[in-house]
Amino acid sequence: MNKKDRVLAAISHQQVDHVPASFSLHFPREIASGEAAVKAHIDFYRETDCDVLKIMNENLVPEIGEMNGPDDWKKIPAYNRHSPFMVRQLDMIKHILDGVGEPVYALATVHGICASAIHPIEERYGYVPVREMMAAHLRQNKTVVLDAFHRIADAMSDLAAACIEAGSSGIYYAALGGEKHFYTDEEFAEAIEPFDRQILSAAREAGGHTFLHICKENLEMSRYAGYGDLCDVVNWGVYEAPYTLEEGRRLYPRATIMGGLANRSGVLVDGTDDELKAAVQAVIRDFGETGFILGADCTLPTEIPYGRIMAAVHAAVK
């Protein structure tokens, strides 16, 4: 069973020769774009022996300048796959897949509606202030903010479809908005969920799988309960949310679950090889081999040795 077939079997809840693994990290800035990023992805895939080739996305919605009030959301224009930042991402995907030279399960990162909406202003103001600003503006002038979200969602939907057409097997959809401290359940249902669903649907309609990554901490996981019909694989911060693998399996009975290890601490980062192997085998023993992909809560530290990741991948082999 090659890596791609192993991942496809896991997604289909079929028997696997061993549990596949998927890990990723943000590459250093100097190798995060262009040809350097192509090489970095291929090196990571080969040196970690992961079953999934996750393609990172640092080609973000462009900066728009100052955001002084809700009306400034009108400054966000419409984008599509021909916009320069998307062209760069799609070209990188194609070059990575050409460079691997073997059957590969490639997963293209698509930032969700919430993340994509903060990217045009995050660098100027900082992550938490921008999250708070966006929530405040939504309450002050919902119409203007939601109009901007519509434009962004249309762009990300086009990107999701284009990623599949470029050769990706699926998308890794990085979702924000489930945190209890930023939105109420009602705000999430109106301002986040419809756009998440639109983008996930676009990937599905293009023939790709959807990996839903529910990011950050203090999550109200029930907000995502209705996403199950649009997700092939679900991943979240088991230790960060907090929400156990078993709870996730009950919430998404038809999806494959991905995770099992903490990403910034614990045995993967700090443990011995023996401790890491024991932890991986315990996760698989407790959860089972069917409908499971070994992974972490989120991206790993940029500086983690690739040998540590390979040790986790190989620990899943019978």
Task: List each language-model region with its residue ranges.
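Active-site loop segments of alpha/beta catalytic cores
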Residues: M1-I31, E35, A40, D51, ...
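Short N-terminal amphipathic alpha-helices
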Residues: R46-I64
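A short glycine/small-residue-enriched secondary-structure motif
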Residues: E58-I76
